[in-house]
Amino acid sequence: MPKTPVLMDHDGAVDDYLAALLLLTMDHVEPLGIIVTPADCYIQPAVSITRKMLDLIGRSTVPVAESTVRGINPFPQLYRRDSLVIDCFPILNEQDEIKTPLLPESGQDFMVRVLREAIEPVTLLITGPLTTLAVALDAAPDIEAKIQQLVWMGGALNVRGNVAIDLEPGQDGSAEWNAYWDAEAIDRVWQTQIPIVMCPLDITNNVPVTPGFIRKLAKQRRYPLSDLAGQCYSLVIPQDYYFWDVLATAYLGQPEFFQLREWETAIVTKGRSQGRTKLEAGGRKIQALDSVDIDRFYAYILQQWAK
C-alpha cells in the first residue's frame, strides 16, 4: 500500500515535538522532512531538539530545515523558554554528535523544493503559524497545485481565543496564538484553493492532558518515546494543557476517530481582533475537526508511544 507523503512544519513548543513523535510512528506516512518555524520557541534549541529527537527514534534520515520567516506578534518569552529546557534533557544528549542533517537552505525554500519535486500531491501538517507556507506561496505560486491538503492546528471558531489579554493588551481575546502570530499569513493561505482541515480550539478545549493520562504514560516510561513525552509534559503540569498539535496529528493517523464540519470563514488581519478566525457567510470554506472519540484517542496515543 503506498504511503502518504507528509511535510511537517512546527514552531518548537512542547506539543510540537510530541506531534512530530506521533507522526513518525505512523507506518502509512512517508515523512518528507520537518521544518521548524521560529515562533513559540527559541529557534536554535528548537532545531537542535528536533534533530536529537529524530536520532533518538532512529529516523536520522528525515531532513530538518530552519525557517527564517518572522511574525508580527511574538510569543511571550515565558512560553518560548521551554525549548531551552528540553534541549538539555538527558535522554536527548547521550550521544556526542547529532546525525540528523540540518539543511543549508531555509525552511521556506525547502518547502518549495519538496513540493516541486514531489511525484504526487503532499499533505502539509502545520502545527504553528502559517507564515512559512505563505512566504513559500509568494515565492512559488505553482506549489499550490502540489498540496493535497493542509492540516493546521490553529484558530478558534465558536469559542474564545487563547491570547491572554494580560500578556497582550492590544488583543481582545478572540484570537488563537498560531493565527495571532501572523494574521496576514493566515489570510494569504485563505486566498488559495488548498483544502484546509483546521484543528481549532473548539475541539482541543475538550481534550486535556489529564493526570490520569500522565500516570498511564509514566507506567510505560521504559519506552523512549513515552519517557520523552512524560518529561515534556512535566514542564506544563502547573497549567491547563491540551492536546493541541498532537490532536491535529492524530487526525492523519486515525481520521475515523473524528467528525468534521464545514464552515464559511474569514480572517481578521487588523485591529484588536487581529488573528481571529471568524465565521462569515459566503467566506472561505474549510473543514474543521468538530468532535473526537476521546477514549480511543487517549488509547491510541499511549499505544503509539509505547516504543
Regions flagged by a language model, labelled:
Residues 1-3, 19-31, 177-180, 184, ...:
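Conformational coupling and interaction surfaces
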Residues 2-51, 96-198, 204:
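Active-site histidine-anchored catalytic micro-motif
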Residues 2-4, 47-117, 284-292, 302-306:
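Metal-dependent C-N hydrolase catalytic cores
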Residues 38-39, 63-68, 94-99, 155-157, ...:
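Short C-terminal domain-edge/linker segments immediately following a structured domain
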Residues 41-45, 73, 156-160, 266-282:
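Short, mixed-charge aromatic SLiMs
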Residues 44-45, 77, 209-213:
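Short secondary-structure transition/capping segments
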Residues 57-58, 140, 253:
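A broad structural signal for alpha-helix termini and local helix breaks/kinks
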Residues 78-84, 164-167, 214-215:
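Short, surface-exposed amphipathic charged segments that create phosphate/polyanion-binding patches used
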